[in-house]
Amino acid sequence: MADFQSIAQQFVTFYYQTFDGNRAGLAPLYRDHSMLTFETSAIQGVAGIIEKLTSLPFQKVQHQVSTLDAQPSGEHGGILVLVTGALLVDEEKNPMNYTQTFQLMPDGAGSYFVLNDVFRLIYNA
């Protein structure tokens, strides 16, 4: 069995570097049956997911990962990944806290794709 923690770390590093630099470049990570829940919007399929991510109302973004937890998931080699962190957008000086969960599945070619992706900002009470 592959080292799920190492795979999760590599995935998260790649995902946020790509998100911060070229959101459209995330398309190969999703499939037509993938689903993204971004705050209150649920989107299925590569085209819809990338349209949502590229239309977010900011130009610059920088993710800072605080925690990363991973577990093997299911009998088909999936990996459940939970990330918490902070992000800065555009010229904002105060970072916003977020949590994001990914369900990664093997693609049959030695890599993984995102089956499920749930993103939520954490607002102070």
Curated annotation (Swiss-Prot):
Example GO biological process: protein import into nucleus
A GO-annotated cellular component: cytoplasm
InterPro entries listed in its UniProt record: NTF2 (IPR045875), NTF2-like_dom_sf (IPR032710), NTF2_dom (IPR002075), Nuclear_transport_factor_2_euk (IPR018222)
Every NTF2 domain range: 7-121
GO molecular function list: nuclear import signal receptor activity
Protein origin, superkingdom: Eukaryota
Protein name per the record: Nuclear transport factor 2
Gene name of the record: ntf2
